[in-house]
Structure formats: C-alpha cells, structure tokens
Amino acid sequence: MQQDDDPRSEKQMEFVTLVAGGQSFCIEITQIREIRRWSPVTLLPHSPAYVLGVINLRGAVIPILDLAAKLGFSTITPTERHVIIITAIEERIVGLLVESVSEILGAQTDMVRETPKTEEDATTRAVDGIIPVGDNMIKIINLDALLQSSLATAA
C-alpha cells in the first residue's frame, strides 16, 4: 500500500510572479484565467482611484483594478507595456493592472514564510505570505481578501 500521508511531503504550488508598485508579488496560477496586454477601459463614475473602469471580455463586463493603488502604492498610468491579469475567485472575475509579469514560480509550502504582523490594514490582509527568492521577497497576494472590499465598491 502506498503512503501519501507522509507529513514530510510538502505541497508543490505554482505562482505567476508580477510587479506592481515596483514590488514583487505573486498569485497562485490556479486563480488566473488569462494574461493580456493593456487595452483602454470604459470609465465608471464616482469610482475609487484604484478602479480604472471596465472592459468587455468576450461578452462579459470585467472590472479592472490598479493593483498597485489597491495595495497602497502610487497609481499606475497605463501604457501599452502594462499587463492585465484576469483573475477568477469563485464566481468573481476581475482584471488587475500590473507593471509586468515575470515568470512561473514553483514553491513548496515550507518555502512560504508568514507575513510579519503589523497594524491590521488592507495591505496586510491582502498578503498571504512571503517567498524569499535570493535577495527578493515575493509577496503572495490573497485575492479573496483583496477583492472582497474592491468588488463591493466597484459594483
């Protein structure tokens, strides 16, 4: 009989690494539907600064958020060099504007470090953990926590 319950066997996870606000982040690959070039959005009146507008993606109206601004960094002025990551959490589909997408990062669960506890704020809740890679600290985005307040505001 094969034993898969070995406590020493760590779960392998895959992330898409990205840059937002000049910082390195990653999102679990299973939460990403597609990655596309920046395209102009339709503005929504009275939206928060991080809600850039909406796009029509194959018949679906998708809100586009500036990830850097949502995380408390300076807003991005979109150019053709920027990228939109279309994410899916449960039934929610949202586009995130980022500066760039780098690579796919494979990591064992034991590589993930706990996010240091500071004042409870949106940024702290939005980061699930940190993966040290060389001199770089890649923050894992908790899309569920990040999008919870954003979608209520954008709707």
Model-based region annotation:
Residues 1-155:
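An acidic, low-aromatic, low-complexity terminal/linker signal
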